[in-house]
Amino acid sequence: GGSGLRCFARAVGRQRGQIESRINVSTPAGIRACVVRSTEAQETVVATVEMGIVRPGPEPDVHNLLAEVGAPVAAVKRWETADIGNPHVVCEVDEPEAIDLLVAGPAVESHFREGANVHFVAVSGRDELSVRVWERGAGVTNACGTGATVAADVFHRWGRVGQQVVVHMPGGNALVDLGTPLTLTGPATHVADLLVADA
């Protein structure tokens, strides 16, 4: 996703000895352009990724998703699916922190044949969203770049936010620009060099 691409672009630039760089990365969802810019912090850069196009997502296997899931999603006001190379369910709530992700996340995801990332989202300020994430195959995660992007896109189409949206997640903040191209911008920090042994 977008967060992984930001980190990958940072790692490639660092390996090449470049503080600022631009690379194109081939992904299953298409070619993604990544631009890395320096910051005042030595090990942190700002990386921007072109995220592609948000399309309608998959349909659940039930007619009324919220009624079928029941109590774990009682706080959901409305929801919509989206796809940006991977499937997402965006759920509007008043307080994302009040949602029991360990219950609500898999309860919603289970109604999508190939699974889906599930996001509980609230407007937290002018052109700002707060998001908590249940990620398919991973569970509760602190951040999701593709999720931040689709949440901003869905809430923009609902008329709740503008074209540039700051998305707050437990793992940090990202800026989504819904222009052309649609971009995700956020920090990427070098933490460690790892040597992976051959199996």
Tell me the role of every PLM-derived stretch.
Residues 3-143, 150-199:
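Active-site proximal loop and beta-alpha junction motif in alpha/beta enzyme cores
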